[in-house]
Amino acid sequence: LKSEMAKSEAPTLFQVNGPVGLANWKDYCMDLSGSELYSHLTSDDFVLKDGNAVQGIAYVIETYGIIYNKTILNDYCTMDNAVISSVDEINNFATLKAVADDIQSRLDEINDKFGYDLQGAFTSAGMDGSSDWRFKTHLANLPIYYEYKDKGITSTDAIEGTYLDNYKQIWDLYITDSTCDPALLSGKTGEDAASEFALGEAVFYQNGTWAYNDIKDNEVADEDLGMLPIYIGAEGEENQGLCTGSENYWCVNKNADPADIQATLDFMEWVVTSDTGRDALANTMGFVTPFKTFEDGYQSQNPLVLANDEYTKAGKTPVSWNFTTMPSEEWKNGVGSALLEYAQGTGDWDAVVTAFVDGWKTEYDAAHAE
């Protein structure tokens, strides 16, 4: 984007990923508060503001959690000495761990009884570049979310790491009750995890609504797909919903030619009001959007999206996407490296804490140095 913005014909429409991205580009962003696009939003929760100026508008809302195979889990529930009799009983970390531990210890028994080819309770927690973001960013959101919630804040220059013991116990569960030896995680990919789940080799798979396209048309039918919140053992998590937010905000370059700006505003309006545009976003791309114009028949039929709707209707509190406040990509990489070293047995958890807490302060200060 830096090189594009430096050109004589710089883009009129661009996107940022959240508050940190906006901080780098806010001097280019037109105030969209008077736009038709803004008037179609269902809530101000889906904008990025600088003061009262609306500088970014989210165009896709995504959700992630622990995707699960309903059929396998329901079959497990019928077994003698199963630790639950219904999936609905999984509403905290202790129960999730008890179920995963039991499934992991009874893989052969489950496979023999039901004809499955289960290799583990959870898919591999691959830490190569195609998969590590699930843990250094999306999973790391949970301890940040609960710390922010306790303090009543939405960002910080210095994270304390209050919930890093919780982060450790969910990470331990992922790498222990798994299809894969932890020593092999550095070479495991996002495609490996998607394939393991899609072929019925694992019951649980941390990912989001976007993963539907990787799963569908395989062994797992749409009606077999469910999603659980990522429980980490925080107080009150029985009322927790899925992690919902956006990393995709449209911004309009206020320095562009006025005719280009108007054409861009007209285009965005067309995307969210025309049949062609709405069909492309809702059906071809499978997006959930934050616009009122999609409420008349342009809602995604992605079963993972529908799972989120069920939590919302049940009054569960969605977990906000606070990872957009992570200080830098370097910070994420530091946490990811420490997680991998810990999983492989070549590093300890203290190194994860150091990367998380000290690394945050270092990277935040570097980004905000005058």
Where are these regions (language model features)?
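A local structural motif
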Residues: D80-V87, D157-I159, Y174-K188, E201, ...
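Extracytoplasmic/periplasmic substrate-recognition and gating elements
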Residues: N52, N218-G286
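Glycine-centered hinge/linker elements that transmit conformational signals in sensory
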Residues: A100-D101, Y146, D150-G187
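Extracytoplasmic/periplasmic solute-binding protein
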Residues: G51-Y59, Y64, A94-S155, A202
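Short helix-initiation/N-cap motifs at beta->coil->alpha
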Residues: I90-T95, L184-L199
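Conserved C-terminal helix/tail region of periplasmic/extracytoplasmic solute-binding proteins
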Residues: D275-D279, T289, T293-Q299, T312-E370
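Hinge/lid segment of periplasmic solute-binding proteins
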Residues: Q15-N74, D112-D117, R134, D224-Y231
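Conserved N-terminal structural module of periplasmic/extracytoplasmic solute-binding proteins
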Residues: L1-G21, L37, A234-G236, A259, ...
